[in-house]
Amino acid sequence: MRDETPEQPAPLRFGYTTGSCATATSLAAARLLLTGHADDAVEIVLPKGQRVMMRLEFCRTTADGAEAGTIKDAGDDPDVTHGALIFARVARAAAPGVRFHAGPGVGTVTRAGLTLPVGEPAINPVPRQMMTTHLEALAAEHGYAGGFDVTIGVEGGEALALKTMNPRLGIVGGLSILGTTGIVRPFSCSAYIASIHQGIDVARANGITHIAACTGNASEDAMRAHYQLPDMALIEMGDFAGAVLKHLRRAPVARLSMCGGFGKLSKLAAGHLDLHSRHSSIDLPLLAQWAAEAGASDALQAAMRAANTSQEALKLAQADAVPLGDLVCAHALQVARDIVPPSVAVEMFAIDRQGRFVGAAR
């Protein structure tokens, strides 16, 4: 008899952040600079104390110093930088300390509101600290009293950055060097959530008091047209409604508009803060219950419960003049108001697949 036991999926692989890659390559280049020894791999210590060995693609001298590169391995996470070449060029400096520069494919900060000052290379604080710690320890080990100029680059980074939130955040010319733990956890979506927080922070720092958090391009277009908002005020939240609402607790704005497809908004209305299908589903019986509270007939309720999709349920309700879109927005609005500070004026909008408004609540 055939074994019907499903095969257990292999555990997902963790990977390493661009910050870890930058640390490994800058350490290897600096070691070559001070000792003349070129490594094939280098061990680094991550922020929580783990020691990891990272393989190098090259480690060689240059006209004014040394450089090393590694291929970014994000494990099983769908990271935009997976497979990219991350490299560091290191040169001696007379003054002690480590100074960072943006090489090809690494962006530069041009707007206030991020963790780095305007004009700085987009190398985040934890990667900077990781590199500084390793390079200062190397200098002490070899009795070197000078400092280092460290240039970090990402091959093809300028094109890859167009797939990220960097252009909207005011990071121009390439990617950011990221990471807080040094490790990429598969499908943690931490980088995306961080970009949502950064988007809100940048908007606040630039005097924007009304932001619109949108689930996708259609909802973003609807908000842009409805309010003539600048791009900086449009927050691409995707499925992470909770990331927006919770961040506003510590970084409030005067006014928040949230807009999404009817199905996504119905999940938020039911109390789900992650709107992805992996983490939440559409509750058709709940939609039917809300319709009943608005006077829907028993026949309509039964048809809605039997619907194949939320869009079908919406069309059934619309045909009977039941304002299901407004009802969903009203419930979603209450969920949001329970999270954000009372000082934030919140409103909800739902759109259909053609980008037309099908519900609103204020």
Swiss-Prot record:
The protein's Enzyme Commission number: 2.1.1.195
Pfam families in UniProt: CbiD
Keyword annotations: Cobalamin biosynthesis, Methyltransferase, S-adenosyl-L-methionine, Transferase
The protein's enzyme class: transferase
Catalytic reaction equation(s): Co-precorrin-5B + S-adenosyl-L-methionine = Co-precorrin-6A + S-adenosyl-L-homocysteine
GO MF term list: cobalt-precorrin-5B C1-methyltransferase activity
Top-level taxon of the source organism: Bacteria
Family: Belongs to the CbiD family.
Name of the featured protein: Cobalt-precorrin-5B C(1)-methyltransferase
